[in-house]
């Protein structure tokens, strides 16, 4: 199992070792903070080159490491753009990919959006070039792009997870902020995800913190809603079958607590949860450990009737059972608690301008 660093970073661990570790991490964060601010000044002052892809670029990113729920946001944006009849391509760095294969996020998006190409490249400027020149993309959605400022973007969307919004108040490694919190001033929109998993007062506090740094930035509230239970072979069941059903969970994601809470909210009884490192590739040793774990649970006082994982895990496991216990996943869809109309209008305005610019170029040619 992976080490749970959250009690240390959050301050819940009060033992002497944890206190010393937080002090050491705080010192290291000072160097990281200086480097992050220097990099930001370089871009803000124009000392670093920013490349134009030639088509609109919509960035979906976050302030923190770990799972904030970007994938359903990316899928939602791509569906909206496809409904407007534009050729969309997703570009990303491809973190966790190996041997030329797509990473788990790209595999999940491919299943969600079979008509949307996905270009993964360590250099996202090159990924944008491939998408535009070779795939004739008319708009790019850059996954995890907030800190990747070398590619110019026309819309910067920051995703904040309500269950852990601001990385314990510190940049890496003392917290999980990728850059200082005031960087949210660059955002054009903020989407707060999983607002249903926290109290309304906490959502108001998140909004207040955002407003301190970006008072004019629109903020939308969203929930992650499971639609059905699916298997790798395409079978599906209504989500209601989980009510009072003993289940065991396995996940290799950045925010396993949020996944577990989603399952609990569906009425299931969670017997155990095997938490693996984020982006674990489920190699043979991991699969053997997984089978042993399930076998042990089957002989326990409350054997699980079903195993559940996330969509990201399902595309890597590629099986419908483990040790004789059915395995399924719950596709998560984005549901807007606040009106989504302003975002839709912003996309239409962005793409309408793109069409006009393209027409002008065609006329001048």
From Swiss-Prot:
Q: Which domain of life is it from?
A: Bacteria
Its gene name is lpxK
Q: Which HAMAP family match?
A: LpxK
**GO terms, biological process:** lipid A biosynthetic process; lipopolysaccharide core region biosynthetic process
Protein family: Belongs to the LpxK family.
Q: Name one GO molecular function term.
A: tetraacyldisaccharide 4'-kinase activity
Q: Which organism is it from?
A: Rhodopirellula baltica (strain DSM 10527 / NCIMB 13988 / SH1)
Identify the pathway. Answer: Glycolipid biosynthesis; lipid IV(A) biosynthesis; lipid IV(A) from (3R)-3-hydroxytetradecanoyl-[acyl-carrier-protein] and UDP-N-acetyl-alpha-D-glucosamine: step 6/6
Give the protein name, as stated in the record.
Tetraacyldisaccharide 4'-kinase
Kindly list the organism's lineage. Bacteria, Pseudomonadati, Planctomycetota, Planctomycetia, Pirellulales
């Amino acid at each position: 199992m992976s080490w749970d660093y959250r009690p240390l970073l959050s301050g819940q661990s009060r033992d002497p070792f944890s206190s010393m570790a937080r002090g050491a991490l705080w010192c290291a964060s000072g160097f990281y903070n200086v480097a992050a601010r220097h990099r930001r000044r370089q871009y803000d002052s124009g000392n670093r080159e920013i490349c134009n892809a030639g088509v609109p670029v919509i960035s979906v990113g976050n302030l923190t490491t770990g799972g904030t729920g970007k994938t359903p946001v990316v899928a939602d944006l791509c569906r909206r753009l496809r409904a407007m009849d534009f050729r969309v391509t997703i570009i990303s760095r491809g973190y966790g990919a190996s041997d030329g294969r797509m990473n788990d996020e790209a595999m999940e998006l491919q299943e969600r959006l079979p008509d949307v190409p996905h270009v993964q490249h360590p250099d996202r400027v090159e990924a944008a070039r491939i998408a535009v020149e070779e795939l004739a993309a008319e708009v790019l959605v850059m996954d995890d792009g907030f800190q990747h400022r070398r590619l110019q973007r026309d819309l910067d969307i920051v995703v904040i997870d309500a269950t852990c919004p601001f990385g314990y108040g510190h940049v890496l490694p003392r917290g999980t902020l990728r850059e200082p919190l005031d960087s949210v001033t660059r955002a054009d929109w903020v989407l707060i995800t999983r607002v249903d998993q926290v109290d309304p007062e906490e959502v108001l506090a998140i909004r207040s913190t955002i407003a301190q740094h970006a008072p004019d930035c629109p903020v939308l509230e969203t929930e992650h809603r499971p639609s059905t239970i699916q298997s790798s072979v395409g079978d599906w069941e209504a989500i209601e079958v989980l009510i009072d059903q003993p289940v065991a969970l396995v996940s290799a994601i950045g925010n396993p607590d949020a996944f577990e809470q989603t399952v609990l909210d569906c009425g299931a009884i969670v017997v155990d949860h095997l938490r693996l490192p984020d982006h674990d590739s489920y190699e043979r040793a991991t699969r053997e450990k997984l089978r042993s774990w399930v076998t042990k649970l089957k002989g326990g006082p409350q054997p699980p009737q079903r195993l559940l994982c996330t969509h990201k895990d399902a595309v890597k496991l590629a099986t419908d059972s483990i040790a004789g216990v059915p395995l399924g996943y719950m596709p998560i869809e984005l549901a807007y608690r606040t009106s989504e109309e302003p975002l839709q209008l912003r996309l239409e305005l962005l793409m309408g301008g793109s069409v006009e610019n393209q027409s002008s170029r065609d006329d001048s040619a």
